[in-house]
A protein has these predicted regions:
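A non-catalytic, amphipathic alpha-helix used as a structural packing/dimerization or gating element
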Residues: 147-157
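Conserved small/polar residues in nucleotide/adenosyl-binding loops
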Residues: 162-164
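Adenosine-phosphate binding glycine-rich loop
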Residues: 143-145
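Structural signal for interior beta-strand "rungs" in well-ordered beta-sheet cores
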Residues: 3, 8-129, 134-136
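C-terminal end-helix/capping segment
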Residues: 138-141
Length: 164
């Protein structure tokens, strides 16, 4: 029942005119939701952290007992599917990746394009993960961690350039 579930905007952010956000969804400041993305908080809460972005065509959803939490400065790439999972701060989820219920992605991670993170899988901080099912390839370098952070910052800076 969506009657009591309404999106909450906790600061300046940007949502594309054709993005869909329904139900119990929280958008922190400097976050952005891009074209054709869908955030369905009709079952559990979806929380998009400060400075995080959800790119074009991505779908975020939940199941009973499995809310979806995205930390600060996270980049959710194009056509990503997130379902009832946790993505910690300063991580990047690559184009077309899928992360399922109760999976937890640590801080400063890169989940490669088209990777599948199965239910209940925990990825430790600073990991590069690729494949289906996703396997830890190696630890990220300091330069790679900084590049992920800078990617999220570029999306935040773009918010001031958008004209509708």
């Amino acid at each position: 029942d969506l009657k009591d579930k309404k999106p909450k905007n906790l600061g300046e952010n940007w949502v594309a005119p054709n993005a869909v956000i329904i139900g119990d969804v929280t958008l922190e400041k400097n976050s952005s939701v891009w074209f054709n993305a869908t955030l369905r908080g009709d079952i559990e809460n979806i929380h998009l952290g400060e400075g995080s972005n959800v790119q074009d065509g991505s779908v975020l959803h939940t199941d009973p007992g499995y809310p979806l939490k995205i930390g600060k400065n996270v980049t959710i790439g194009h056509l990503v599917m997130l379902h009832g999972c946790t993505i910690d701060d300063n991580s990047l989820i690559g184009i077309g990746a899928v992360v399922l219920n109760k999976a937890k992605i640590g801080k400063n991670c890169i989940i490669g394009a088209k990777s599948l993170i199965t239910e209940n899988k925990e990825i430790p901080d600073n990991s590069l993960v690729m494949g289906s099912p996703g396997k830890i390839i190696r630890q990220l370098t300091d330069d790679e961690i900084e590049a992920v952070k800078q990617n999220a910052i570029r999306y935040q800076e773009n918010l001031s350039l958008i004209h509708i």
